[in-house]
């Protein structure tokens, strides 16, 4: 596969040799971070949702692996990730008191930790957790930011992508923004549209 402005680095043969889903997530992340046209150093984050065995109950549970706070996806390793019980993370909406209390939600992420060796979860964790997709990439490509920061960014996004990329206006990253991303996906699905991504106003691309 060839692209005009970015390099397509994915190697099907190499990916096929990676049997562990978390390792494959790391491989994907490193490729995205290798091209600074896709995201700036230290910017963006990636995630994968997998099924794993709960060490206490032995039951299969859904776990989300995500780049931890800080770090760079281009050099990401497993030790730089956070792994969280997805059901616990999503249940935090039951105690969410509103946008004025975003900071207290970050502390509650620690109650959702699955892997005790996890790095601290980032403020973007709910943005990934509330979306229903297995693989999620959040990047800051210069081209996307040019659209996201434009005065008519929403209109430009609709015209360029024909409704396949949603739009959510700028808001500080955190729990409330995660709920807005989910609402954007839900609204599109109610119209029979499956979004391929979401443009975040003055921010970047999901």
What does each model-found stretch correspond to?
Residues 1-206:
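Glycine-rich flexible loops
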């Amino acid at each position: 596969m060839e692209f005009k402005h970015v390099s397509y680095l994915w190697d099907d043969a190499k990916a096929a040799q990676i049997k562990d889903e978390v390792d494959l997530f790391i491989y994907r992340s490193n490729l995205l971070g290798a091209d600074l046209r896709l995201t700036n150093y230290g910017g963006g984050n990636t995630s994968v949702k997998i099924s794993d065995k709960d060490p206490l109950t032995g039951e299969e549970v859904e776990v989300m692996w995500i780049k931890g706070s800080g770090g760079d996806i281009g050099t990401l390793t497993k030790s730089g990730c956070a792994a969280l019980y997805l059901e616990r993370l999503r249940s935090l909406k039951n105690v969410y008191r509103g946008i004025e209390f975003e900071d207290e939600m970050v502390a509650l992420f620690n109650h959702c930790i699955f892997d005790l060796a996890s790095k601290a979860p980032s403020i973007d964790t709910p943005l990934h957790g509330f979306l229903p997709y297995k693989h999620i990439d959040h990047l800051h490509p210069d081209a996307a930011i040019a659209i996201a920061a434009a005065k008519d960014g929403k209109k430009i996004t609709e015209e360029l992508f024909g409704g396949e990329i949603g739009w959510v206006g700028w808001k500080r990253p955190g729990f409330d923004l995660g709920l807005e991303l989910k609402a954007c996906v839900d609204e599109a699905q109610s119209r029979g549209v499956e979004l391929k991504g979401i443009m975040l106003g003055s921010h970047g691309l999901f």
